[in-house]
Amino acid sequence: MDFKENSIYINVMDKIYAREKEVLSQNQDFQENNLSRISLILNYEDFSLKFDESLHGYSFGYVTNPFGLKLHSPFTETVRFDGAEKYIYMKRILGVPSNETQLCNYQHQNFEEKDSQKELLPSPQQLTPPTSLPSLPLLPLPQAPEQNEEQQLTQPPSPPSIPPPPPQKKQIQIFITPSGIVSQKIQNFFRDTQIKSTDPVNCSLDHSIKKNYSLEEIYENNKNYMDKNNNFLHFLFTFIDKITIKDLDHFEKEINRVHNIKKLINQQNMKGETPLHSLIINNSESCLKKLVIAKINHMGIFDYSKCDNLNKNLLAHAIEKGDIDVIRLVLIGGCPLKMSPRSKLFKKNFKIYRQQIYRVFEIKEFLTKIGFNQYIPMFLEFEFKNININYLIESFKFKLNINEDEILLWKLLTEPYKNLDFKSFCSEYQIKHQNDLISETMANHFINVCQLNPHFGYIDFHTQIGSAGNASVFEGTYKGIPIACKEMPVSGTYEQSVDSIKEIAAVGQIKKLGCATVVETIGVLKYNQKLFLVMVKEKCNLLSFLCNKSEILKMQREGIWTSIFKISKDILKGLVSLREAGMYHRDFKTANFLVSNTGKILISDFGTSRDENEKRLNTFAKTIGTMWYRCPRLGDCSEDEKTLTHYNEKSEIYSLGIILWELVCVAMTGTYISPKIPLFQNEVDFLIWIHKDYRFSFPVGTPQSFVKLITRMCLPFRDRRPTVRQVLDNVKAIKKEFLSNRGIEGEQTYSGLECWREFNFSKQNVTRISISNLHNTEYKVVNKYDYASYNNKNSLLMKRYLDNSNFVVELINPNGLFRFKSFFEKEKLLYLKLKSTYKDEYYFDMSQFLTTIIQIHQITVIYYKMLQKYRELRLLRNNNNINKNKNNNNNNNNNNNNNNNINNNNTFNNSTNNNSNDNINIPYDFNNNNNNNNNSCNNSKKFKSISESTSALGLEASSSSSSSS
């Protein structure tokens, strides 16, 4: 070896050792976890340096053992060599092709040409490769302190044809410590110790089998190479490679010759890993993994119940690797399942096959019970091809020779999640059968639900899609049908267990009548000490449907009022069906109605439902239902009015009135408006406020028929509310009214004509406008582009946007300076909407609002009158005295103008009072402000002047409208 080649060789070795020391010095955990299994006492020639091509054009060095197997250590994958170094080293020093496969084949050819007689290890002076023949690369040998390492490496090679015999039959071995430094004490210890060892060539497994060496002899010769925790099979299965082991029949023969093979295959190291654990965990070839596991299964010598220190068995590691064939073989061997369907392991890897994995255990149990263990692989093949086992029963009936009783037993075993009966459930959860808790009728309804599906197959549910009260709802599939599994809180308190029975019994009571307006129930599933109510999964709930803008646009294209009428009729028909079944739902809201794929509205969530004949009347407390949909007088009466504390049919009419109000607001505004009142954060404040006979406001233009119906449904005293049948008849009558007035042109006397035209703002002859009941609202000039501050709930903002090819103006409440010049557009109809907001959300129930259609010059009048009122109320910030004087002069002029406008508008107000609502579109008279304020929600004197300015503004707008028309 010339000086240039020797320098490259030394450079490569220096890189390897330097990188190894750097990695080990920085990461102590890496040293303990990865080097503990390969800290071996190795012969000098037992390692060779090889190269691998990387994806980025670099070459990585790695070290091989006597079998030609790759040893993974910190420096094997981090040392990079440039192209010149690799080419010179592979071509000139090794003298063999750079391809790894060709290199190994070349080595095996040399192995067969050598003598089969075992050779002793030569001296260190003989280890340098000859220049003429190809040889394996060598690691630098650490020398004794009196000998320089660099001089050792630069010694000229000795010709291989005349090998001088060693002075003593001693083997020179090195010990690679975790820090990568050779221990001098161990080296001196083995210098005078003669250990039996085979030649590196003869240590190859293929060569050993060919020379009739047994694995037991190989293990005895190589046990010093392994650490004390791993046996030979750990070592073999960890570094198994496709090149060295090609015929596992020889492998099986040699395993049979080992007397303690069963002990070795089940031996665990410090990490609790068996040799099969090492086989699956390490990056060995998948085909070899399958062959080795198949041979071990055939021999039946491995205990699959063994787990490592992390409590993971072979199945858990196989799932982490994601190899379906390895999982199948592990299951055939009898590996138990120690994970739930919703475990992190299943969520991370292998979601598709978890259902089959669970079914495999039931199939194995059944086949073992009837004595057909040999058919387990056949059925597993079908299971892992996504074929349901139920379809195979008839096909294999004759082959397995089983009768009908055994087939029934098969179904019970392969479908383990069977329905439970009432008695077993009550006895398990210690529920007493008392008349005041669970009646016989309720028990019968419970049993009927359990018998809806006699035998459940495996239900795959893993994703939580929502919650209903204290219960979680999961999404899953059953026989190809999307389902929703509601977890029943049976493992909690005694009351929760009883409530679960009552909910299931309520479903059975409704199911008995065949109500088509209730979500379809499949049955009851008991799984993992939990109870699940299995239902068909629908599209979404009604709340999500109304909040979805795309769905609203779709309804507008098809006719939004037609959709609203259909939804209202489905909801009312559902309530009628509950009344026929003698049930009270007690929690009606949009979130508890489901929208099916066909657009039908179905009732769901019977967690608070009760039978009308239930004797425990104290269950009808004021806490039932959702706060914003709850009857206001419920549970808030004196003891003399005990009958009002009971829940009845009229109590649910109030909740339906709120739902109809939500639907009407969607039809009128095109957006969903929540009935939630954010000012009241607790239940007590809500009850105090709701007892003031508060009525929700309606957008202007709402049909009077709907206004009157919803107002009657939401009356504080329930005796005055209509029945369900009356509400259904009224909705049908309103629909006829809609169909008869929708096509009439030019009719201006009908209130809400534009509403019936479904946002078709094409009319040019708008006769009047009115601004009413803007109480508790300060007028403030705001900026169109400033949306940062939403803290002041009483300020206003005018914003323009385009809706159905019509310009729309909104008054909302961010602070700032408003620019009005962009609104001067002629012959365009604008939609003016006054809103009061709170925390970036719109609520119509904060005050009275206005919705009307006006022309563009009317907006300018309103705008300039606003500015005049600002100056009157001194809301504009003026720092100079001159500006204050100007404002005072302007205020005097404005007061005179306002008085004139009021006097001129008295006749207009008298003519329009007959056609207006009690709460909507009532023009204000400046002289009658006190009377109007008494009818409002707030009688505070704080906003008296503001209310007067609001009324005056309404009169001015009305006068401008009448003059312009």
UniProtKB/Swiss-Prot annotation:
InterPro entries: Ankyrin_rpt-contain_sf, Kinase-like_dom_sf, Prot_kinase_dom, Ser/Thr_kinase_AS, Ser/Thr_Kinases-Pseudokinases. It catalyses: L-seryl-[protein] + ATP = O-phospho-L-seryl-[protein] + ADP + H(+); L-threonyl-[protein] + ATP = O-phospho-L-threonyl-[protein] + ADP + H(+). Residues 119-136, 144-155, 881-940 have a biased composition (Low complexity). The chain crosses the membrane at residues 653-673. GO terms for molecular function: ATP binding; protein kinase activity; protein serine kinase activity; protein serine/threonine kinase activity. ATP binds at residues 465-473, 486. ANK repeats lie at residues 271-301, 310-339. GO terms for cellular component: cytoplasm; membrane. CDD domains: PKc. Residues 156-168 have a biased composition (Pro residues). Residues 114-170, 881-942 are annotated as: Disordered. Signal peptide: none annotated. The active site is at residue 587. Residues 459-739 form the Protein kinase domain. One of its GO terms (biological process) is signal transduction. Its EC number is 2.7.11.1. Keywords: ANK repeat, ATP-binding, Glycoprotein, Kinase, Membrane, Nucleotide-binding, Repeat, Serine/threonine-protein kinase, Transferase, Transmembrane, Transmembrane helix. The keyword Nucleotide-binding applies. This is Probable serine/threonine-protein kinase DDB_G0291516. It comes from Dictyostelium discoideum.
